[in-house]
């Protein structure tokens, strides 16, 4: 199985390296094209006003291409130009921090997988519910085995499998649950701070209100210790609103 591996935390991130080695141990051919620098929460951004430069990374049994660009840049450049062998699957992760609910709109990790799907490839995004993962070897091995079990040919066109791990060892996690994503939005605020020179700046903070999270959704199940899998599809159409608007305009 040929894999294009990318992420949004950067090519030297713990999660990407763990997933790389897990896939390699499973006998897969892994080609890495990932951002040189962290690109968290850049969404589906592409570089239009700056050139994309590429740097080769080789160390400690790892080899990959780092791109001075966004996660989506990496996937587009990799699939169209850089890869020697076309992949069977595009895999993005393992991200530091869960990607559930509205996170999927902000996430560079999910967007990279989505770009792979839009370009016609099966795709999976993988995240871990902690911003400070120390050891993700077992999660990497789990993903490698899961990739073999997913019926990719039977999934809908341009479907992304969004996988999230709870912040516990795999052996201590609750069973895998296939579920929908929560529709709860973040309640955001900005903390006003001051730098050493007396200049004001702002730092984003926020919470996802627990009381508004529906039972059985990704955030709910992940909090309860389950590994969650949510199939995503790029289609923002509000079909009910179509009928309402047609009636309003007499169409």
Curated annotation (Swiss-Prot):
Keyword set for this entry?
Cytoplasm, Hydrolase, Metal-binding, Nucleotide-binding
Output the NCBIfam families linked to this UniProt entry: PRK00346.1-4, surE
**Gene3D superfamilies assigned:** Survival protein SurE-like phosphatase/nucleotidase
Q: Name one GO cellular component term.
A: cytoplasm
Return the Pfam families for the record: SurE (PF01975)
Q: How is the cofactor bound?
A: Binds 1 divalent metal cation per subunit.
Keyword Hydrolase annotated: yes
- Function text: Nucleotidase that shows phosphatase activity on nucleoside 5'-monophosphates.
Enzyme Commission number, as recorded? 3.1.3.5
Where along the chain is a divalent metal cation bound?
A: 8-9, 40, 95
Gene transcribed to yield this protein: surE
Species the sequence originates in: Maridesulfovibrio salexigens (strain ATCC 14822 / DSM 2638 / NCIMB 8403 / VKM B-1763)
> Which reaction is catalysed here?
a ribonucleoside 5'-phosphate + H2O = a ribonucleoside + phosphate
State its location(s): Cytoplasm
- Name of the protein described by the UniProt record: 5'-nucleotidase SurE
Q: What are the leading ranks of the lineage? A: Bacteria, Pseudomonadati, Thermodesulfobacteriota, Desulfovibrionia, Desulfovibrionales
Q: Read off the InterPro entries from this record.
A: SurE (IPR030048), SurE-like_Pase/nucleotidase (IPR002828), SurE-like_sf (IPR036523)
Please list the cofactors this protein needs.
Answer: a divalent metal cation
Family membership: Belongs to the SurE nucleotidase family.
Q: Does the keyword Cell division apply?
A: no
Gene Ontology molecular function: any one: nucleotide binding
